[in-house]
Amino acid sequence: MTCSPLLLTLLIHCTGSWAQSVLTQPPSVSAAPGQKVTISCSGSSSNIGNNYVSWYQQLPGTAPKLLIYDNNKRPSGIPDRFSGSKSGTSATLGITGLQTGDEADYYCGTWDSSLSA
């Protein structure tokens, strides 16, 4: 059986159009089915450093789905193959036991305290 790698495409950066808050992700990650991948999200002290991080999965033609909230919590129905962590101004999404259905866009998101009025 031939295993072809999955390509997990990622948002390169999340920005508010009226703000200068940027979260940086790698452009893509690929791995074979059954393997593990980690997806990084880098920010600053005003966003990731002092706020909770969420992760979203967007399959082609569908709305984004919440995978992780409050850094490492999973909503009901999200398998434990998905995990989140945060350290300093960076966050990571881990996916174990990759499946073909995991091929999607993945987004990190957080609040930026510097945008508070």
Swiss-Prot record:
Residue positions where Pyrrolidone carboxylic acid is found in the record: 20
Region (Framework-1): 20-44
Subcellular location: Secreted; Cell membrane
Sequence ranges assigned to domain Ig-like in this UniProt record: 20-117
Region ranges (Complementarity-determining-1): 45-52
GO molecular function, a single term: antigen binding
Domain of life: Eukaryota
Keyword annotations from UniProtKB, A to Z: Adaptive immunity, Cell membrane, Disulfide bond, Immunity, Immunoglobulin, Immunoglobulin domain, Membrane, Pyrrolidone carboxylic acid, Secreted, Signal
Gene Ontology biological-process annotations: adaptive immune response; immune response
Signal sequence coordinates: 1-19
Renumbered residue ranges of the record's region Complementarity-determining-2: 70-72
One matching Pfam family: V-set
PROSITE patterns in the record: IG_LIKE (PS50835)
Cited Gene3D superfamilies: Immunoglobulins
Chain spans, region Framework-3: 73-108
Residue ranges, annotated region (Framework-2): 53-69
Residues covered by region (Complementarity-determining-3): 109-117
Primary location class: secreted
Disulphide bridges: 41-108
Any one GO CC term of the record: immunoglobulin complex
Quaternary structure (record): Immunoglobulins are composed of two identical heavy chains and two identical light chains; disulfide-linked.
Chain's role: V region of the variable domain of immunoglobulin light chains that participates in the antigen recognition. Immunoglobulins, also known as antibodies, are membrane-bound or secreted glycoproteins produced by B lymphocytes. In the recognition phase of humoral immunity, the membrane-bound immunoglobulins serve as receptors which, upon binding of a specific antigen, trigger the clonal expansion and differentiation of B lymphocytes into immunoglobulins-secreting plasma cells.
Protein name per the record: Immunoglobulin lambda variable 1-51
Organism of derivation: Homo sapiens (Human)
Organismal lineage: Eukaryota, Metazoa, Chordata, Craniata, Vertebrata
Gene designation per UniProt: IGLV1-51
